[in-house]
């Protein structure tokens, strides 16, 4: 049986086939992209592609630079041709939860900007409903984070925790906190997103709804390509 890393690597050829000679590329954050990015950089170099990357986190920007990928800031481009990113959960409608790496705000900005958004996952990320195996991240202001937490818990039977890293509050690249929400089955993601996004102090949610153009899934039986 193949492990998760092997399942992700199975998707490599399908990911690389999306990249062509002259494009602005949105580069996602997380373990999947860290695994695939060196191969993407090698392809760009070998074929002499004129690729400019727009990165979703400081960490992935540092890695891309080390690999020789030309990068720029989001405000230096007026379009993104293709965004490639991982996901924490994907439901049967190809709706997604992201934000396990804490970069959900920048990821959503870049993925929404892209003409095409391709998601790469292994089969363990496929779920029947969003929140089945992964908590929903919500990026919030430090000032009133606890009051936001209480309001989220009052919405339904939702357990909310402020994310910590080695006993210290996790801080996003934007200087905010992350609240991780354990969702019960039956939560409507569209309605819950609307509730959250209208709370003062909420910057963004980890719901990526109706955004993915294609999901590439590494499975024990091979690679599956899912599209709406």
UniProtKB/Swiss-Prot annotation:
GO function terms (MF aspect): ribose-5-phosphate isomerase activity
One Gene Ontology term from the biological process aspect of the record: pentose-phosphate shunt, non-oxidative branch
Highest taxon, organism lineage: Bacteria
Keywords: Isomerase
Enzyme active site: 107
Calcium in keyword set: no
Cellular component GO terms, alphabetical: cytosol
EC code(s) of this entry: 5.3.1.6
Pathway: Carbohydrate degradation; pentose phosphate pathway; D-ribose 5-phosphate from D-ribulose 5-phosphate (non-oxidative stage): step 1/1
InterPro entries per UniProt: NagB/RpiA_transferase-like, Ribose5P_isomerase_typA_subgr, Ribose5P_isomerase_type_A
Function: Catalyzes the reversible conversion of ribose-5-phosphate to ribulose 5-phosphate.
Protein name: Ribose-5-phosphate isomerase A
Species in which this protein is naturally found: Staphylococcus aureus (strain MRSA252)
Primary gene name: rpiA
């Amino acid at each position: 049986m193949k492990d998760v890393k092997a399942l992700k690597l199975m998707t490599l050829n399908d990911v690389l086939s999306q990249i062509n000679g002259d494009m602005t590329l949105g580069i996602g954050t997380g373990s999947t992209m860290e695994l695939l990015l060196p191969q993407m950089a090698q392809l760009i170099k070998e074929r002499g592609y004129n690729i400019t990357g727009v990165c979703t986190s400081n960490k992935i920007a540092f890695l891309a630079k080390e690999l020789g990928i030309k990068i720029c800031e989001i405000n230096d481009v007026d379009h993104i041709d293709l965004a490639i990113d991982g996901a924490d959960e994907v439901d049967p409608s190809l709706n997604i939860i992201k934000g396990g790496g804490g970069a959900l705000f920048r990821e959503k900005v870049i993925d929404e900007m892209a003409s095409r958004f391709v998601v790469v996952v292994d089969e363990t990320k496929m779920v029947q409903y969003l929140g089945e195996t992964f908590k929903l991240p919500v990026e919030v202001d430090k000032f009133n984070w606890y009051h936001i937490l209480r309001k989220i818990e009052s919405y339904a039977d939702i357990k909310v925790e402020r994310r910590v890293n080695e006993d210290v509050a996790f801080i996003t690249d934007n200087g905010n906190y992350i609240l991780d929400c354990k969702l019960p089955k039956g939560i409507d993601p569209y309605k819950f997103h609307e509730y959250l996004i209208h709370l003062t102090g909420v910057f963004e949610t980890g719901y990526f709804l109706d955004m993915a153009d294609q999901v590439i899934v590494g499975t024990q039986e091979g690679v599956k390509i899912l599209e709406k």
